[in-house]
Amino acid sequence: TKEFVDNIKSAFIEDIKIRIKPPESHTERGLRTKITEIQEGVIYQENGITVLAFNVFHGGGVKHAFGYKIIYKNRSVVISGDTNYSSNLVTYSKNVDLLIHEIADAPDSIKNRSPKVKGLMDYHTTPEEMARIIKEASPKFTVLTHILLLGGISEADTLDKVKSLVNNSYDVEMGYDLMGIDVKDEIITYSLDYSDEK
């Protein structure tokens, strides 16, 4: 993480030099960073909120891929991060209130003839893997996000496929921009609309 952040700063060094001189005269205070490398386990605990990081399998030799579990007032949310099927993710997701999980789909005909597409699917969670995760983890509600759909497959097709594979026994929705989610006794999703705000 430190190397990544340092490289981002290096990429923008010329812009930074311009912005700290007149007429803009910005300070470099906003560029200061405090990097904390994480590993599996508790990474934050304050004011009744606990955040756990856990390893997931992103495939293709990717190291240091993490999912996150957030616990607050007997409610729990898991964010999968980039992954395909991961037994560790299932362990951390058991009976959570909300599972926010990535999804990827492509027609078999394209996967079978394109090593690039097959490779992408190996880095991400297919509908079949998603159904397995849902069945094994039994989340109260699942929102599919970080959506990668290739070859003309629609979000509706992929959502229907996942629901069918879990026999429509679990609540699953596709995520979307400005989606709001209330994690209470009943999970409520809604669209945030800021179009009238000035």
Feature names for model-found ranges:
Residues 1-77, 156-189, 196-197:
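Binuclear metal-dependent hydrolase catalytic cores
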